[in-house]
C-alpha cells in the first residue's frame, strides 16, 4: 500500500510530505525499554522532526503516527516506523480524559514460543506466549497461571506470540476480568484473570 508521511523534517522546512509504501506490519524489538510494540514499517522518508506526524493512505485515512527510524549513520536509510492508529487512538483518548495512561497487568514474565520450546513442551505449533515466571500475589498468580504454561488466547483473541499477549493485556483496562486459554502439559486449560494496573517504569 502507498502511504504518505507528514511532518516538519529537522524542524526547519515546515510541513512536508514524503511518499513510500508499507514494507511490513507488526515490527517489534526496536527498543529494550518499550514492551508495547507493533510498528508499521515504511520506506517513506522519516527524519528528525517527523516524529508525531501523520502516516496516511491515499484516501487520506490516518493509519499511523510517525515514530522512529532504523539507522546506523543517523540519516534516514529507507527503514521508518509508525505506531498504528489502532494502538495510538485509545492512548490519546485516555490522556484527554484522565491525563494518564492505565495499562492492564498480570505480573508474569512472557516470551514467544520458539521451535525448541514447542518441541520440549510437545506443542503442535510454535505459537503462543510462554510463561517464564509468575510474580507471587500478582493477578496472574491469583488466576492460577503457572511457569511453563503457554497462553494461546486472551479475551477471545488468538495469541500468536509474546507481542500479541503483552499488547492485548496492556490495552485492556485494569480491574477488568477476562478469560485466558493456556496449554498446560498438553491440555487446554481455561482461566479467568482480573487485571491489575501496570506499574509505571521509572526512567533512569
Task: Name each model feature, range by range.
Residues 2, 8-9, 68, 156-157, ...:
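Short, surface-exposed secondary-structure boundary micro-motifs
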Residues 6-20, 26-52, 57-99, 103, ...:
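Active-site loop architecture of trypsin-fold serine endopeptidases
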Amino acid at each position: 500500500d502507498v502511504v504518505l508521511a507528514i511532518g516538519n523534517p529537522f524542524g526547519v522546512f515546515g510541513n512536508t510530505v514524503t511518499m513510500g509504501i508499507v514494507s511490513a506490519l507488526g515490527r517489534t524489538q526496536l527498543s529494550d525499554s518499550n514492551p508495547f510494540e507493533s510498528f508499521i514499517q515504511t520506506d517513506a522518508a522519516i527524519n528528525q522532526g517527523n516524529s508525531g506526524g501523520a502516516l496516511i493512505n491515499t484516501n487520506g485515512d490516518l493509519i499511523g503516527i510517525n515514530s522512529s527510524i532504523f539507522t546506523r549513520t543517523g540519516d534516514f536509510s529507507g527503514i521508518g516506523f509508525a505506531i498504528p492508529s489502532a494502538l495510538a487512538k485509545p492512548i490519546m483518548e485516555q490522556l484527554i480524559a484522565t491525563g494518564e495512561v492505565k495499562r492492564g497487568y498480570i505480573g508474569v514474565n512472557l516470551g514467544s514460543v520458539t521451535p525448541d520450546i514447542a518441541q520440549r513442551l510437545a506443542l503442535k505449533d510454535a505459537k503462543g506466549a510462554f510463561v517464564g515466571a509468575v510474580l507471587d500475589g500478582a493477578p496472574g498468580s491469583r488466576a492460577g497461571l503457572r511457569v511453563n504454561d503457554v497462553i494461546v488466547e486472551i479475551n477471545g483473541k488468538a495469541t500468536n506470540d509474546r507481542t500479541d499477549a503483552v499488547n492485548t493485556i496492556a490495552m485492556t483496562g485494569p480491574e477488568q476480568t477476562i478469560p485466558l486459554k493456556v496449554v498446560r502439559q498438553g491440555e487446554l486449560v481455561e482461566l479467568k484473570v482480573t487485571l491489575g494496573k501496570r506499574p509505571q517504569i521509572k526512567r533512569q
